[in-house]
Regions:
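NTP-dependent nucleotidyl-transfer catalytic core
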Residues: 1-304
Length: 304
């Protein structure tokens, strides 16, 4: 049950409440960015655990990654430092009272009273924006740069693009997605209640199994997985990315209407008809055979 996430939340709380621990964490980050091999190796071990967990969980939903780009590699490869030097040359920066490197983004329509972007901590270690800029500079030379972000990251992405414009570099395009909501509120937030995907998937299997038991005498785990995971995926994917998904299990597992079980059932029926036909299906349809108004209307509805 996602032990790494539980451990992270526990440790993060302790660090937030203990100034000494916070300083130790910052020291480790400093060593990481300055190429300490021991720290880098320990860091990689933790990242690998997280990545393997993601791959395992998402493979159950038939979701696969083509390639991984590690944010941390931009730290010890010094690419964040290179990006910072380029930004220094623009002259559009200052150091605040905490000695943090701050990019001045005046002149860009960002909808901020004070359009600035903080890039480093007071000790010089990088923050997320600097790493994202370094990544954008690198990936921007290798084709299209499209990022997928939560809708609450729109301003942040505009700030990153403003920095890239200052450097006269290619900006990144973004696809924004909204939140998945349950009856009790957001499914996932940085703070507060979090529903893990792993738990959400377990709930899908449980509810699909219950639904099948009510309909059929015999069921198997494979059928429950196909229907449960299908309901989960389709229930989210059928909604436009920019709209909130109001996820309701009763609707998602309904065998009637615009749902995954209905589509799966229709597919099974069609497959059964084709199997009984016992002939080779034509590769191209001959629409000249449709000589009645009703047939044409039916085809239009099926293709809509």
């Amino acid at each position: 049950r996602n032990d790494l996430a539980v451990a992270f939340r526990t440790k993060a709380k302790k660090v937030a409440e203990n100034e000494k621990l916070e300083k130790e964490v910052l020291l480790l980050l400093n060593k990481l960015e300055n190429g300490d091999k021991k720290i880098i190796n320990e860091f990689k071990k933790i990242v690998d655990i997280s990545i393997k967990g993601q791959i395992k969980i998402l493979s159950e939903l038939n979701i696969k990654y083509d390639k991984f780009d590690y944010e941390s590699s931009y730290l010890w490869s010094r690419k964040t430092h290179e990006a910072l030097k380029l930004l220094e040359k623009t002259g559009k920066f200052f150091f605040d009272k905490d000695n943090r490197f701050v990019l001045d983004e005046k002149g860009f329509e960002l909808g901020m009273k004070v359009p600035v972007l903080v890039l480093t901590r007071g000790d010089g270690t990088s923050l997320y924006p600097l790493r994202d800029i370094a990544y954008a500079l690198d990936i921007g030379t290798k084709g299209k740069n499209i990022v997928v972000l939560g809708e609450d990251q729109k301003l942040y992405n505009e700030q990153i693009n403003a920095a890239l414009k200052l450097l006269e570099k290619k900006t990144r395009k973004a696809v924004y997605y909204s939140f998945v909501l349950l009856d009790e509120g957001k499914m996932s937030t940085r703070k507060g209640n979090i529903v893990l995907l792993e738990d959400f998937m377990s709930e899908a299997l449980k509810k699909a199994g219950t639904e099948l038991k009510q309909r059929y005498k015999k069921i198997d785990s494979k059928a429950a997985k196909v229907i449960g995971y299908g309901a989960l995926k389709y229930g989210i994917l059928k909604v436009s990315p920019e709209k909130n998904v109001i996820f309701n299990w009763q609707q998602a597992l309904n065998f009637e209407g615009e749902t995954a079980p209905y589509i799966q059932y229709a597919y099974a029926r069609i497959s059964s008809i084709i199997k009984k036909y016992k002939r080779q299906l034509p590769k191209k349809a001959d629409f000249s055979l449709l000589d009645s108004k009703e047939e044409i209307e039916l085809i239009k509805k099926l293709s809509a």
